[in-house]
Amino acid sequence: MEFYLEIDPVTLNLIILVASYVILLLVFLISCVLYDCRGKDPSKEYAPEATLEAQPSIRLVVMHPSVAGPHWPKGPGLSLGDPAPLGKKSTMV
């Protein structure tokens, strides 16, 4: 006495579809655990992330000429007059 279970082709396709989604979800979760969910390879060592306190401050220094030099000829297109001396400016960031 043999017993055969007949499965409708639509039901079989649905079972295969659900099983494939479950397998893809398991592969994703396993890879997320292995790769620390940040895309970093666990077999490589990474430098620790720098904090804001450990970074050095950046100092910007802007130099302006106080007197126009002879290498800048004044032509008819340059009618700026006599610019006031600007000096040295610095900005601490």
From Swiss-Prot:
Coiled coil: none annotated. The chain crosses the membrane at residues 14-34. Residues 73-93 are annotated as: Disordered. It is found in: Membrane. It comes from the Eukaryota. Keywords: Membrane, Transmembrane, Transmembrane helix. It is a single-pass membrane protein. One of its GO terms (cellular component) is membrane. This is Small integral membrane protein 36. It comes from Homo sapiens.
